[in-house]
Amino acid sequence: CPYGMKLYAMQWAMEQGHQSILWLDSSAWCVKYPKVHQDAMARDGYYLVGNGDWKADQWTNDACLAHFGLTREEAAAIPLVSGGIIGLDFRNEIAREFFRQYAEAMNAGAFKGSWTALPEEGSGERYRGHRHDQSCASIIAHRMGLFRHPEQTYDYYYQPTMPDTVEIALAGL
């Protein structure tokens, strides 16, 4: 699964001695120094932002749900986090445990699946496809009791005029 590259990149950065890592997908860029992100990572051990009102039951295939021992009904209570912005401060046990579970899910094949709703991968009227690492990160964050940092405050879908609080802008490529 290509989304495993995020974990390999984070692992490599840790091996190079970096302790605080802010992953940004290629569609995200800093519009100013990410101080709020860095401060949150230092304070909380992580930075996770929500992904609208989407829930894990909508974007997680049956195999991934089975890996985590969840039903689709249980997953309906789990909000999605964005896979495009993930910050971890590995000096914090919370970040290390999140990463451990994230890597375990990747190694178990839970990232694998189709972006579109294939009947052989998912069931239920609400199922729309699989979001790979994002689905796993959402379930892990929920189980660990991690909160989502504010949406559309420090991270914003690009517009010509954005709030002064925005540090990272997102736009499709």
Show the residue positions of the predicted features.
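Glycosyltransferase catalytic domains, chiefly GT-A lineage
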Residues: 1-173
